[in-house]
């Protein structure tokens, strides 16, 4: 009986530490991912007229994003299995951050369409990658609760993303850039930074984690 209580306490302590160390960072990553996915809608308020983008061309670009996302989902998951979830999550974030920054310099319908397709390809596999990473650390009986907490990033991004995007659009003229360009660059840069931090902050295995004691690692 004492052993059962002891094991239960160790498990609770381990889950608590993992939750505080891993979950907030992954929520932040997904928060940035969701903002980078939808911020083009805010940018369009001034971007479409500036680069001569029609509503049809804009909608076509949105379609290309999801087409690329679907096409590259399986290859991305296969690469993730070979390279590991942590490294692949970092790669995805750095790549989509770079594409997001480059989107600020599109000049017309063709470059816009290409940028949306590339962003979809870059982001493909992120959500499955995060889920796989979480399963490496949390027992199955905790996963429903953990994923529910992780998904808080979506309403959070909707709540913060709108006023943030409006604020950034107001920075028209900064460094000679249009407001929509400032918006896309400043909301894409965090993805690159977080991608690099993934390699440092997210542990690969329990063996090299200093913030778990030996009993918790076992």
Feature roles, as predicted:
Residues 21-55, 71, 161-165:
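Extracytoplasmic
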Residues 38, 66-74, 124, 158-159:
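Residue-level signature of mid-helix packing/kink "hotspots" within the transmembrane helices
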Residues 52, 84, 105-111, 122, ...:
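Helix-breaking motifs and short loop linkers at transmembrane-helix boundaries and internal kinks
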Residues 71-110:
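Conserved MFS/SLC helix-loop-helix module at the cytosolic interface between two early adjacent transmembrane helices
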Residues 115-152:
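Cytoplasmic helix-loop-helix junction between adjacent transmembrane helices
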Residues 144-169, 173, 190-191:
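Glycine-rich segments within core transmembrane alpha-helices of 12-TM secondary carriers
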Residues 181-200:
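Symmetry-related core transmembrane helices of the 12-TM Major Facilitator Superfamily/SLC fold
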Residues 198-212:
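Helix-loop junctions on the cytosolic side of multi-pass membrane transporters
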